Amino acid sequence: MVTELVAQRRDLANLLGVEPSDEPIHVFLFEKPADYRQYMLNKHPDFPARRALFVKTDTQLKIYASWHPRVGEDLRHEVTHGYLHSAVSDIPLWMDEGLAEFFETGRGKRGSHGAHIHLLKTRLKQGKWSPDIHRLETLDQAETMTQLDYAESWLWVHFLLFNPQVRDQHLIQAHLIQLRKHGSAFGIADAIDEKFDSIESVLIEHLKSL
């Protein structure tokens, strides 16, 4: 598992064009989930109740998690946050979480996330969801995000990285590089509006192809 997490650093750099810093990421892995929950309740009572958490302080990057059947997924997700935040500040929440959902699937899977695909296709068929990246860009608190928000954030990331109609624009890569250089960057939603018409229908076709 450790080898995979270390290799993920290079995978992220190669895909996104940003090099994480050499700042260490401290992982606190509890043997029992109950011990983890109690520790987080005592030390970080204001944090949301999650199976694992990434915490960035002024001096350290920390991950808290516990052993359980999906610990690998959790660590890949949180380590992605660590690598991203060591390289770039002020990443939009939807992109931060979408990339973490992308990389949590493991190496060699090109970010394919079966649970998100199923959820989005089901809600689309029921008429209970339609994509809206402008709405995602307004999200600024992870604890308010729903599972559908995570799924849609993942889909936009996967779409922008791999769909042949948009991938050559390198929008995510350009956004992150601009953030790193200048501390601020163009909005992805506005850039999409300028370059494409009816991009939501293209996104839905991308989803249906997965």
Model-derived features: positions:
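Helical anchoring/docking segments at protein termini
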Residues: 2-7, 20-22, 55-67, 81
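Hydrophobic (often cysteine-bearing) scaffold residues that line and stabilize catalytic clefts
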Residues: 1-4, 72, 76, 92, ...
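Zn2+-dependent metallopeptidase catalytic core
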Residues: 1-28, 76
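Solvent-exposed coil/turn segments that connect beta secondary-structure elements
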Residues: 30-34, 68, 79, 87, ...
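Active-site recognition of the HExxH zinc-binding catalytic motif
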Residues: 27, 73-86, 97-101, 157
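Acidic helix-start/capping segments at beta-turn-to-alpha-helix junctions
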Residues: 18-38, 98-104
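A short linear-motif detector with a strong N-terminal bias
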Residues: 4-8, 31-33, 41-43, 79-82
